[in-house]
């Protein structure tokens, strides 16, 4: 992605933090996926539940929202917390991998700086759709 695209992704991720529902942990997380054609940015925020096992991470909210809108191929995903940089949890890494073996994952800092890793770096030797063929 070009510098302008990464900046736009950061702004969308940052904006998504305001939609976090985190009354138990007070740990707001926002995420945004970018369609493979770079034309669509779809964001999500974490949603907590009193029954903690029912919580859903921001990355999965963004991806399921995108899939429900007809998007199934992504070139990038960005994530950050209101407290700064975070990385996707294991479940989110597997969900990200479901839709792209080559996606870049941008983990943003408060100031717009970021660390970028591929999903392969975050989830090496992964299991995915091709393994079921």
UniProtKB/Swiss-Prot annotation:
Gene3D superfamilies: Cytidine Deaminase, domain 2 (3.40.140.10)
Binding positions for substrate per the UniProt entry: 46-48
Reported function: This enzyme scavenges exogenous and endogenous cytidine and 2'-deoxycytidine for UMP synthesis.
Cross-referenced PANTHER family: CYTIDINE DEAMINASE (PTHR11644:SF2)
Keywords: Hydrolase, Metal-binding, Zinc
Species in which this protein is naturally found: Schizosaccharomyces pombe (strain 972 / ATCC 24843) (Fission yeast)
Domain CMP/dCMP-type deaminase: 4-130
CDD domains given in the database record: cytidine_deaminase
EC assignment: 3.5.4.5
Name of this chain's protein: Putative cytidine deaminase
Active-site residues from the entry: 59
